[in-house]
Amino acid sequence: AGATWTLADHAYEATNSGIQIGASDLARELVGRIVGAAEQLKVKCVISPECGHAYTAIRWEGPNLMGRPFGFEVKHILEVLDDLRRAGKLKLKGTLDKPLTYHDPCQISRRGGVYEQPRTLLNQLAPQFREMTDSGVMNWCCGGGGGVSANERAEELRFTVFKRKKAQIEELGVKTMVTACANCRVVMEEALEHHHMDIEMLGLTELVAEHLDEGKPNE
């Protein structure tokens, strides 16, 4: 796509456990590593990976924790991919010829506002993309939000909450579900196994990668 990028060797972990447990000093330290690396490298944009809490930590909580605005943009990887696609710098080829649906991660969609970009990408890659009844900002949680995914004692709670998602999947009759949050993916993979559901889970970024056109992009 013609973009220059780098990966800081001392600020590569984006998930912020300090925010998850309410420890503001730790949260500030972890965000500070990323901000410090970004400023040292003089980057124009910091890209959050497929992790809802990482996106929240650096984009929305970060400036408050640091007490100042950033001199760089923060975007979710799906925002970047869709920006490149619209600019003609990222070309996709082929399609996934099977019915599938998309799970909107709470932190990315409901809180972050990133819900149009995944659909733009999916509509190009998956002609049989099907929306859940409640989607976008109204989509149901995977069952692992609010730190529940990290609590072993909350396993039954996760499986119970997932029943609503289970009903959504069964209503559509799909065998493949795509998402853009690693935490959601792990939680739902465990719940799918628990409920004996033969559903394939995919990350949208990996789906895009598998359909990249290696031809020369537009200048």
Residue ranges and their predicted role:
Residues 1-219:
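Iron-sulfur cluster-binding electron-transfer modules in prokaryotic oxidoreductases
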